[in-house]
A protein has these predicted regions:
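NTP-dependent nucleotidyl-transfer catalytic core
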Residues: 1-193, 197, 205, 212-217
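Short glycine-rich loop/turn motifs that provide flexible caps or phosphate-binding loops at active sites
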Residues: 35, 46, 69-70, 76, ...
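Conserved nucleotide- and phosphate/pyrophosphate-binding catalytic cores
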Residues: 210-421
Length: 421
């Protein structure tokens, strides 16, 4: 067993809080740990990737992952980090999400590991067998109201105008019991999670100590936020999902390749398995080779999430869609239609109309004056070819497949226009 797994996490900034100074020593020998995801959606998102990646690293070093998909807790809703109560999802939606999440999560773990084969469990399996009296008498009795009310996630909500329902208030008891149950059944003695889960993790540690007289541990990692304070992992379209049907490898790659320089080192540390020496070398090249670090980040994460096939698809689509070298073969056009923002316009709004008007109508640029400036600055393109004449008019000769054209602003913003005749 490697003695550096704790240091590996610490060096990369993975550790926000640890419940014990003994954890570094504890992690020197194999243990079972758990990481939980509630099925509030049918896929994990990029924010969940930190916990999944940590689970992958721990498993590589011989620790056994137990991944908990919260079929029961998902029906209740976690108030942690939320200003308002979540809308409750139906049992049917939760079950559909449980099934989908389970399939996605299976991709990232080694089920053939000789000593640390993972388990994916659903807490609905044990909570559905408990009645209310049993739960309140055996579990609820172990929780002190003062401690529960003192938690930040509870205190902030209770004192807010919206308040907090008993349903949400009880969430920490459910998650606390999960830890105790997994300790008793599978010998789990470590829970990992985002920093917003610290209070829930401590609840499980306290419950296990009360009921089993044993010590278990918790480790949290920081939530992914950008340098401007905004949550990392959301594009204009919404969350960056790990399920390919919801977010293509190309979309994930494009999101990551646009990470600002000031954020890219942190994201390389938190989202990839690259060693710190290599990350430091990559970051040193930022000034000499712009976007090199972002490309490496995008390649590494896309490869980990979507495999070699997904990375190849993302790189192929990126190449096909780059202004100045757009690939208009059948494969390239397919990549554009699947991955590029697109709009349908009447042919009368495009043909024989000034390029400037069409760009504004497409939504790529808001005003004609901005488009004129773009042309002056050599950043306007039609089908990958630079437009230098502000009076340029689009004709049928410039259509692809007789009904398509691509307008671009610089190298990163493009819209595919589908003409309706």
């Amino acid at each position: 067993m490697s003695e550096t797994v704790f240091d590996w996490f610490l060096e990369r900034g993975f550790i926000e809080q640890s419940t014990s100074d003994d954890l570094k020593t504890i992690l020197k020998t194999p243990l079972s740990f758990y990481f939980g995801i509630d099925p509030t959606a049918e896929s994990p998102h990029l924010g969940n990737w930190v916990g999944i990646l940590a689970s992958m690293k721990l498993q590589k070093l011989g620790h056994r992952p137990i991944i908990l998909v919260g079929g029961a807790t998902g029906l209740i809703g976690d108030p942690s980090g939320k200003d308002l109560e979540r809308p409750l999802l139906s049992a049917e939606v939760i079950q559909k999400n449980v099934d989908s999440l389970t399939q996605v999560l299976k991709k990232f773990l080694d089920f053939n590991h000789p000593t640390a084969a993972p388990l994916i469990v659903n807490n609905y399996d044990w909570f559905s067998k408990m009645n209310m009296i049993e739960f309140l008498r055996d579990v609820g009795k172990q929780f002190r109201l003062g401690t529960m009310l003192a938690k930040e996630s509870v205190k902030n909500r209770v004192n807010s105008e919206e308040g907090m329902s008993f349903t949400e208030f009880s969430y920490q008891i459910l998650q606390g019991y999960d830890f105790y149950y997994l300790f008793e059944k599978y010998g789990v003695n470590l829970q990992i999670g985002g920093s917003d889960q610290y209070g829930n993790i401590v609840a499980g540690i306290d419950l296990t100590r009360r009921l089993s007289k044993k010590t278990v541990y918790g480790l949290t990692f920081p939530l992914l936020v950008r340098s401007d304070g905004k949550k990392f992992g959301k594009s204009e379209k919404g969350a960056i999902w790990l399920k390919e049907e919801l977010c293509s490898p190309f979309e994930m790659y494009q999101y990551l390749v646009r990470v600002p320089d000031k954020d890219v080192k942190r994201m390389l540390q938190m989202l990839t398995l690259l060693e710190m020496d290599e990350i430091n070398l990559i970051v040193k090249e930022i000034e000499k080779t712009p976007n090199l670090a972002q490309k490496r980040l995008a390649e590494e994460v896309t490869l980990l999430v979507h495999g070699e096939k997904g990375l190849k698809e993302a790189l192929g689509a990126t190449d096909a869609l780059s202004p100045g070298k757009m690939n208009f073969c059948e494969e390239g056009l397919t990549a554009m239609q699947e991955n590029m923002p697109n709009i349908e316009l009447s042919s009368s709004d495009v043909l024989s109309k000034p390029y400037i008007d069409v760009v504004v109508r497409s939504g790529l640029i808001e005003s004609k004056s901005e488009v004129r400036r773009l042309i002056q600055n050599q950043g306007a393109y039609l089908n990958g070819k630079k437009i230098t004449d502000p009076n340029f008019v689009i004709t049928k000769d410039f259509l692809l497949q007789e009904n398509l054209c691509v307008v671009s602003a610089g190298k990163k913003k493009s819209v595919l226009i589908r003409l309706k005749f």
